[in-house]
């Protein structure tokens, strides 16, 4: 696992974007695994800038997203399909027919089967990841066991509370979500995690601890053959990480 400590969020976003930039230029038909949340937004803006100003071409790129709320249509402003359109897809020359975010409405079982089929038929080159305050990856919540494949997850109260800032009230936050399984995440060729400054406990477990702990799913990144963790110096200093 490679840890890249950056002086600030701007530098972090540029360095993280470099990985995707290099992959897309080398393999124009690559499949990217994408994530939502506040952590990757700056990186997405940098990729959009490079598409507009530096000829970074997404026209043949495919993508599959980690997760989606159950019960929200793609037109809902808090759905992850809407997030991806608003923060990336509308600003680059990607063909949206080549992008996949699980369906939040309709028959849940059918939607889940389709999600697993798409993942299993995708050869993800780089999987973008954020991390929850409790160390969850996508919506793989802490617990005694972790799932290999995509499934419908009941969200922990801490996750609901963390995501409430995006909704009018905490009561509006969906209680379930479709999420890519941990095994599917780990099968990506490269993992790219952006760890924001308020994730101190998860950072301690991942960067300072020795355990692979299902109660802190992000620790399983230690097993991956090509994983990158990007964080700011402020967070590294907070937890005492010196490399």
Features from the language model and the residues they span:
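N-terminal glycine-/serine-/threonine-rich phosphate-binding loop
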Residues: 1-32, 109
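Glycine-rich N-terminal segment of FAD-binding domains in flavoprotein oxidoreductases
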Residues: 26-52
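Short beta-strand segments
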Residues: 33-37, 65, 102, 128-131, ...
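A glycine- and small-aliphatic-rich helix-loop capping segment at beta-alpha/alpha-beta transitions
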Residues: 46-57, 80, 142-151
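Ligand-binding beta-strand-loop-alpha-helix segment within the catalytic cores
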Residues: 56-127
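Glycine-rich phosphate-binding loop
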Residues: 122-147
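Class I SAM-dependent methyltransferase SAM-binding "motif I" and its flanking Rossmann-like core
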Residues: 138-182
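ATP/nucleoside-binding phosphotransfer catalytic cores, i.e., glycine-rich phosphate-binding loops
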Residues: 183, 187-243
């Amino acid at each position: 696992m490679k840890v890249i400590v950056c002086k600030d969020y701007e530098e972090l976003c540029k360095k993280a974007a470099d990985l995707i930039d290099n992959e897309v230029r080398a393999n124009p038909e690559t499949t990217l695994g994408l994530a939502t949340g506040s952590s990757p937004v700056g990186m997405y803006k940098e990729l959009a800038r490079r598409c507009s100003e530096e000829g970074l071409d997404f026209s043949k790129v495919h993508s599959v997203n980690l997760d989606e709320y159950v019960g929200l249509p793609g037109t809902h402003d808090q759905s992850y399909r809407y997030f991806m359109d608003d923060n990336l897809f509308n600003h680059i020359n990607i063909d949206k027919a080549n992008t996949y975010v699980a369906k939040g409405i309709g028959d849940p079982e059918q939607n889940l089967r389709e999600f697993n089929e798409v993942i299993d038929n995708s050869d993800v080159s780089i999987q973008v990841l954020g991390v929850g305050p409790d160390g969850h990856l996508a919506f793989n919540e802490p617990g005694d066991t972790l799932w290999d494949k995509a499934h419908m997850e009941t969200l922990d109260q801490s996750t609901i509370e963390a995501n409430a800032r995006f909704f009018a009230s905490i009561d509006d936050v969906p209680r379930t979500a479709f999420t890519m399984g941990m095994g599917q995440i780990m099968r990506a060729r490269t993992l790219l995690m952006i760890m924001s400054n308020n994730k101190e406990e998860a950072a301690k477990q991942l960067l300072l601890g020795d355990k692979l702990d299902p109660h802190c799913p992000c620790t399983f990144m230690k097993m991956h053959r090509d994983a990158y963790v990007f964080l700011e110096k402020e967070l590294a200093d907070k937890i005492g990480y010196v490399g």
